[in-house]
């Protein structure tokens, strides 16, 4: 979600925020006078690691603090939970989907993370990340954010999109729309202002995947014509290979 890096307080129209809920890092932004502004936290950081630590007592810890705790507490520090959104246990590949934290992956029930005697759904853990992003937005906006547009990979199926929407609702947000990441990228770079019918190629090298999408712009409306990629060629996979 490119754009100017926002600091200070802004009055966002309609109290709607845009969220890039990523596999490894996430961002929150608003639109000010037609320009996307990525909001920073109190320490000036625009990226929020998509990491949640669930201690045995107390509330979950999200972001940089959770990431720092990963080395000492890998079994209770949840990373790359986006990979499990909307997936059933029988869809999990034990060879490639083997995190350090314990997951329940038996049968055809939804994937869950087992910690401290309870099971956490991917939606619940993603909601913790979204709550942290909402808090960052609340610090930078005059009006409390109540609604959000959340991006998802173009290849996400209905179950994965519904899981993302549910995570937003668990975070206390009204999810106005789920949009494809390539479309969000094209909008952020102002390609919707092009006057002529245009086809655009968008490459997305993220923490979980490497994708190529072909978009067609016609009168300000984007349509995803085709998308192709490798769901096991993201930054996580490169790190694991190294």
Ranges and model annotations:
Residues 2-108, 116-123, 127-128, 135-242:
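Oxyanion-binding/catalytic loops of NTP- or PPi-dependent enzymes
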């Amino acid at each position: 979600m490119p754009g100017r890096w926002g600091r200070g307080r802004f009055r966002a129209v309609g109290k709607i925020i845009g969220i890039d809920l990523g596999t490894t890092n996430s961002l929150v932004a608003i639109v000010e006078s037609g320009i996307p502004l990525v909001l920073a936290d109190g320490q000036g950081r625009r990226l929020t690691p998509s990491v949640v630590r669930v201690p045995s007592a107390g509330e979950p810890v999200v972001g940089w603090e959770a990431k720092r705790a990963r080395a000492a507490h890998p079994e209770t520090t949840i990373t790359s939970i986006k990979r499990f959104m909307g997936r059933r246990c029988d869809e999990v590949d034990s060879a490639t989907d083997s995190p350090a934290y314990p997951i329940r992956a038996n049968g055809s029930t939804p994937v869950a993370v087992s910690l401290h005697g309870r099971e956490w759904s991917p939606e619940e853990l993603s909601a913790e990340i979204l709550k942290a992003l909402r808090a960052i937005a609340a610090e930078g906006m005059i009006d409390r954010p109540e609604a959000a547009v959340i991006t998802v990979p173009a290849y996400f199926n209905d179950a994965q999109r519904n899981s993302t929407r549910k995570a937003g609702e668990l975070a206390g947000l009204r999810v106005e729309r789920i949009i494809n990441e390539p479309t969000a990228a094209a909008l952020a770079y102002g390609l919707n202002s092009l006057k002529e019918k245009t086809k655009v190629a968008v490459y997305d090298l993220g923490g979980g995947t490497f994708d190529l999408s072909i978009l067609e712009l016609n009168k300000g409306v984007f349509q995803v014509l085709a998308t192709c990629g490798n769901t096991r060629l993201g930054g996580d996979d490169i790190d694991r290979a190294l």
